C-alpha cells in the first residue's frame, strides 16, 4: 500500500498533467504547478474519491499546496 504522501502526489501529477517528480510537498498547485480554479476543484474531487472523504468548500479553499492536501487527508482519515 502506498503512503498517503505518495498517493496525493500521484493524484496531483495526474490531475495537473505534470511529472510525479515535479510534485514536491512545498509546491503550490496554482503558483508552482500551473493549476487554474477548475483544476483545483477537480483535484479536490479526485482526493475525495481516492481517500473516501468529503472535503467541504471552506476547507478545500485552504488546500493550496501538496503538503496542505497531505495534512488534510491525514487529519481526516477514518
UniProtKB/Swiss-Prot annotation:
Pathway the protein contributes to: Lipid metabolism; fatty acid biosynthesis
GO cellular component: cytosol; membrane
Molecular function terms from GO: acyl binding; acyl carrier activity
Modified-residue entries (O-(pantetheine 4'-phosphoryl)serine), positions: 37
PTM note: 4'-phosphopantetheine is transferred from CoA to a specific serine of apo-ACP by AcpS. This modification is essential for activity because fatty acids are bound in thioester linkage to the sulfhydryl of the prosthetic group.
Family: Belongs to the acyl carrier protein (ACP) family.
Function: Carrier of the growing fatty acid chain in fatty acid biosynthesis.
Stated name of the protein: Acyl carrier protein
Origin species: Pseudomonas putida (strain ATCC 700007 / DSM 6899 / JCM 31910 / BCRC 17059 / LMG 24140 / F1)
Taxonomic lineage of the native organism: Bacteria, Pseudomonadati, Pseudomonadota, Gammaproteobacteria, Pseudomonadales
